[in-house]
Each structure stands twice: as C-alpha cells, then as structure tokens.
Amino acid sequence: MEDLFLKALPLLRELKKHGWQAYFVGGAVRDAQMNRDVGDIDIATDASPEEIEAIFPKTVDVGKEHGTIIVLFEGESYEVTTFRAELEYEDYRRPSGVQFIKSLKEDLKRRDLTINAMAMDEEGRLIDYFGGLRDIRERLIQTVGDPAERFHEDALRMLRALRFMSQLEFELSPNTKKAICENRPLLAHISTERKTVEFEKLLKGKAAGRALEAAAETGLYKELPGLDGKKERVLAARAFPFYQLQKSADIWAAFIHMISINPAEAHRFLKGWKLPGKVIRQALHTAERIDQKWDAVSMYEAGEETLLAASAIRSLRDKQAIDEEQLAEIRQSYQALPIKSLKDLAVSGSDLLNFRKKPAGKWVSDDLKRIERAVLNGELANQKKAIEEWLDSCSQI
C-alpha cells in the first residue's frame, strides 16, 4: 500500500471503530493500480456528515448537503463523503438532490468511468464491481453502465472521457465513442468555464493528439468555443506536444498558433473560452511572437518570459522537443541587453524637459522611444551626458 494511503489509514480505522464502513475511492485508487503518482486521497463511508463531524474534532463543511466533509487529520486534509445515490438530473449537468445510502456498490455505480469507480479497503484489497481493473489492463475509457445514460446525467462526462484518454494514454471503448457521437449536442448545456477546465487538462495530457483526433471523429469539437467548422485545424494541432509546456498562457498560445487563429480573431477566440484576462493577454503576447526573428529591439519589447515561451513553442513545433541549449543562448542574449525596461534608461521625461527647455507634449514620449531604440541598437551609451549630447546633435540635423 502506498505511503499516502498508509498515512490516511488511521482515519479509515477510526470510522470503522465507530461502526461505519470506510473505503479509499476515486482517482487515488485508480492511480495506485496504474503505478502512477497518487494525488489526493478520498474516502467514502456510510457515516452521515453529522456523524463524521462528531467523530473528528477538526472538520470543514464544504458541501454537507451533498455528503462531503473535509477532515483535517495529522496535518493533512481528506475529503470524506457519505455513500449517496443521486436523484434525477437537471439540465444535463447536476442532480436535483442526493440520498444518503448504506451500499458501497450503489455509491460507486453513480460514478462516470469504470476506472474511477473502484474502491480499496484498509487491507489494500481492491473492490471492483464494474471492471475498472480490466479496463486499465486493456487501456480503455469505458463508462459505468450505459454511456448514453451517464452522458444524459452530466454531459461534461463526454469531454472528461477524452480528457482521461489524453492523460492516461487510453482509447475510448466502442460503445462510449458511439454514445459521444450521438449525444454530443448535450454539451451545449454545460457552462463554458467547466468545458475550459476539462479541455485545458486534455491539452496537458501526453496523448492530447489522440484525444483531439477523437474530438474530431466524434464531432465533439463542434460543441467547444470557436471550434465549430474548424475540424482540419483541430486535427492540425495533434502533432504538438502541449504537455511539455507548464503555463496555461503558453498552452493557449501554442493552441491558437497550431489551429491557425489569426491575430485579428485571437482575442475574441480566447475570450470565448472565458479565460482570465491575464492569461488572454499573455497568450496573445506570446502567440504573435512565435515566428519572430529576434533582434535587440524585439527581445526588449517581448520581455524575457515571452521571449523564452515563444522560442520554446517554436522549438516544440519544429523539433518536438525544447532545445535547451538554444534557450540558454536566447536567455543570455536577453540578459546582455543594455536596458530591460524604460525605467532603466539613464534619463527620464523630466530630464528631457530640462534639456529641451520646451513645454511638455508628445515629443517627450517620442524622444524617449528614439533614445530607447538607439541604446538597444548599440548606437548610444546609456549615460545621461551622452544622451544629452546625442539629442543636441539630432536637433541640429
């Protein structure tokens, strides 16, 4: 049993000591079976939220009405959820309510995919009612029960299926793929924000290319912001290894570049995904510089972060790998610039007013820009006296 499970074991045993069932569930169980790094440990029990709160002194109510309590235990936080059955779903996205139950099997039955519907007891024994382990061995994404029924309950599960396909490097089972083809319009009922979270996770997976291909094959791409009518462009993005990029803005910059969104459309396209303004600005700033031929001025205007991001994206596009040696040279070139921002200039707007003895006006910013370029291009030393003499000579021409 993994160390993270062992650390949480006393919590499981405490629930059992009080007469309740308790099991490890969810992604941690799946990842342990796949020998992947285990993340958050989740626990399911037949104890009610109130009974969980009565057993453990430190708890946080994060959704008691849905049966979920955070238990703070030995310096860690664990999500402990009461076995539940979900009542009828509304709007293809959420249940009208939940009913607390006593059966682990019925609780696992409501989950989306077989690989996410396994449990593990305190002895490390796997409880697998729906063939999750079989699907792990066969590397298949398969819903628990009828896929059409699962997708009608929550249409986001179709996109989640592709996301797990990307992250785990699995394939869709034939009946799951068929159900996505038939039910994809239901994704229109899901908020853009939820779709964006899943799609970004999809792009970060090692098999994003195969998942994008599945999105094209099933038509699911048509239900995503700004992608309807762009099947060939979506397929063109398959070749890019997005997982090698760390930052959200860089991933979106690479995506709009690979699907050939032109600069005039790019802002509207990214806004359509309801991304944070900062991510949009950074993505646009990077995307427009991916094919930039760098000189001192363009490096200065880009800034180090964008310079390196744009260069990494170009390297990944052309070589399928980041050329670390080339990036080191680019970083060195940037560090060698005489100035990194306007405030690094040896003169300010006030200095120019003193030099020129003229009323303030647009000429101040124009002169600063001229000085900036001359310094960057090595035509002028970044020294106050040299700049004053240079301005004098310019004004006499």
From Swiss-Prot:
EC class name: transferase
Binding site for Mg(2+): D40, D42
Sites where the protein binds ATP: G27, R30, R111, D154, R157, R160, R163
Annotated positions binding CTP: G27, R30, R111, D154, R157, R160, R163
UniProt entry keywords in alphabetical sequence: ATP-binding, Magnesium, Metal-binding, Nucleotide-binding, Nucleotidyltransferase, RNA repair, RNA-binding, Transferase, tRNA processing
Record field: catalytic activity: a tRNA precursor + 2 CTP + ATP = a tRNA with a 3' CCA end + 3 diphosphate; a tRNA with a 3' CCA end + 2 CTP + ATP = a tRNA with a 3' CCACCA end + 3 diphosphate
Similarity field: Belongs to the tRNA nucleotidyltransferase/poly(A) polymerase family. Bacterial CCA-adding enzyme type 3 subfamily.
Name the record gives this protein: CCA-adding enzyme
Lineage: Bacteria, Bacillati, Bacillota, Bacilli, Bacillales
